[in-house]
Amino acid sequence: TLFPYTTLFRSLPELTNLYYEGTKVDAKDICFLGTRDLDKGERELMKKAGVTVFSMTDVERYGFSSIVQKIVQFFTERVDMIHVSFDMDVLDPMFAPGTGIQLPAGLSNREALFLMEEIANTNLVKSAEIVEVNPVLDIRNQTAILAVSLASRLLGEKIY
């Protein structure tokens, strides 16, 4: 399923109703970037929930910078804070070989660093996670080092 933890915890109100009862994140405020392989059930669930999705086809069609501008605008107009969940397997395996799922035609390291910098510039990031780094599959710590660089950019590090 697309949201395994929310599905699992849906029946545990003591975990889902922290601070107040009800939904904490509206699906319409969720944005995915770089999707390459969604199964039919995931696609239907995301469409039904109103999740915004920019696939790698969209990146090719409209250009990466344009998509990032749309994402920044999407969040700055809709929310007061952002949680970033960056899944390293969105990257092309050439740049991140140490992930569990290695699909070709993913984001480049430069695109990912640019994305993190632009999201950081919104000053809306309140929490983040960088996931899917598998050291067993990594080559010369390439994926791990990139993950650290991405976190640094998200925390405000600039090249210049």
Task: List the predicted regions and their residue ranges.
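Conserved phosphate- and dinucleotide-binding cores of soluble alpha/beta proteins
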Residues: 9, 14-18
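Solvent-exposed alpha-helices and their adjacent loops that cap or buttress functional pockets
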Residues: 19-25, 76
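Short, structured patches in soluble enzyme cores that scaffold and shape functional sites
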Residues: 29, 34-37, 55-57
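Catalytic cores of soluble, metal-dependent hydrolases
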Residues: 45, 52-160
